[in-house]
Amino acid sequence: MKKISQSIITKRVLWTLFFLFIYCLGNQLVLPFVDLKNANIFGGAIGSLAFSSAMMGGNLRSMSLFSVGLSPWMSAMILWQMFSFSKKMGLKNLPIEIQDRRRMYLALGIAIVQSLAVSLNLPIVSGVNASLAIFMNTILLIAGTFFLVWLSDLNSLFGIGGSIVILMASMMANLPYQIMDSIEKLGIGWNVLLPLILFSLVFLYVSGVVQRARYRISINKINIHNRFKQYSYLDIMLNPAGGMPFMYAMSLVSIPQYVFMLIQFIHPENKWTSGAIKALTVGQPLWLVVYLVMLFVLGLAFAFVNVSGEQISERMRKSGEYIYGVYPGQETSAYINHLVLRLGFIGALYMLFMAGAPMLIILVNPDYLQLSMIPGTFLIFSGMIYNVNEEMKALKLNTSYTPLFENV
C-alpha cells in the first residue's frame, strides 16, 4: 500500500514539474513585433502593472505569451462569487455546466480588456502595420491566459496544487528581482538589511502560526462513543479567508487601470483618463486607499466563500450531526455564519495590519513600493505552501493503514 501511495505522489509531482516546464517555456515566447530595445518599454502604465501581473501568474516584463497571466480568470472567479450572493440572480440554481460556461465568458471579457490595453501600450517595431501587430498580440495574450487556465485544470487532475503552483512559480521568479532591484535603487546597506531579514523571519513565523490556528466547535455525532467526544468537532480557521484576498485585491484593483488605458487610446483628447490612470497607478495614494478597502472587503467576503454556514448546516442535517445547544437547520446556519463574521473581521484586520500597514511607507517614499509588498507576498506564499502540504498529506493518507491480511 505504501509503495502504491508513493508511486501516486511521484507521478503527480512529475506531472507538476512537466506543467511548470511548459509554463517556463511559454514565458520565453516573446510577443511578435514588439520593440524590446525601446527604452520606455517598461515605463508608464505597463511598468506600474508589472508587479500586480507577477502576483497572478503573468510577466509583463518578459512581454511573452503569458504576460497577462491568470488575472482575468481570477477576477472572473471573485466577481462570480459576489454575483452568486444575490438570490435575485439565482446563479447558484443554474446547472454546473452553465455556471462554468458563464464564468468563462466573464473571464473572456476581462481578458479582452486587459490584453487589448497591454497591446495598445506596447512599442511596435518600425515598418510593421500597427493595427495588425495590436490585433495579433491581443489574440496571443488572450490565448495565453486561457492556456494557463487549461494548464491549471490539468495540474489539478494529474498534478499537485492546481493553479497555486503556477502562481507560486511566477512569484518565485519575480520576487528575487524585486528585492534586489529595490535594494540597489535605495542603496540599502547591511545595517538596514539585517533587521529586514530578521523581521521577515518573525513575519513568516507569525503567519505560519495564524495559518494553523483554529476555532473548534464541539459536535455531537451519531454512533460515536463518548470517549471520542473530544475528537468530534468542527474547526474554523482564525483567518478564514487565508492569504487570497491580497492577491485577488491586486487583480481587481488593476482592472480599472486597464479600462482607462483602453479609453485613453480610443479617445486621446480626454485628459481626465490620463489623470485617472496616474491616480490608480500602483503606489499612488488613491490606489493605496482603494487597495486597502478592497483588501478588507475581500477578507470578509472570502471568509464566507471558504466557510458557508448554509452548506455546513445542510451537511450536518443529512448526517444527523448537531452542535451542542444549537437546533439543527436554520439556527445552526445562523450560528456558524455569525461566528464566521467575527472570525472574518479578525482575519480582515490581520490582513490589513500584516499586508496593508507596511505599504503606508510608500506615502513617504514611493521607491519602497516593492519592499512594502513583500509581507503580503509572504502571506500568500505561506498559505499556498500550506494548501499544497495539506494535499500531499491527503495523498499520503493510505500509508497510515496496513492491509488486513498482511501478516497472514
Curated annotation (Swiss-Prot):
GO cellular component, one term: plasma membrane
Key words, A-Z: Cell membrane, Membrane, Protein transport, Translocation, Transmembrane, Transmembrane helix, Transport
Topology class, membrane: Multi-pass membrane protein
Keyword Nucleotide-binding: no
Main location: membrane
Record's subcellular location: Cell membrane
Top-level taxon of the source organism: Bacteria
Alphabetical list of InterPro entries matching this protein: SecY/SEC61-alpha (IPR002208), SecY2 (IPR014269), SecY_dom_sf (IPR023201)
TM helices/strands, residue ranges: 13-33, 65-85, 105-125, 131-151, 157-177, 186-206, 246-266, 285-305, 344-364, 368-388
GO biological-process terms attached to the record: intracellular protein transmembrane transport; protein targeting
Complex formation: Component of the accessory SecA2/SecY2 protein translocase complex required to export cell wall proteins. May form heterotrimers with SecE and SecG subunits.
Function in brief: Part of the accessory SecA2/SecY2 system specifically required for export of possible cell wall proteins. The central subunit of a protein translocation channel.
Protein family according to the UniProt entry: Belongs to the SecY/SEC61-alpha family. SecY2 subfamily.
NCBIfam families in UniProt: acc_sec_Y2, PRK12417.1
Protein known as: Accessory Sec system protein translocase subunit SecY2
Organism: Streptococcus salivarius (strain JIM8777)
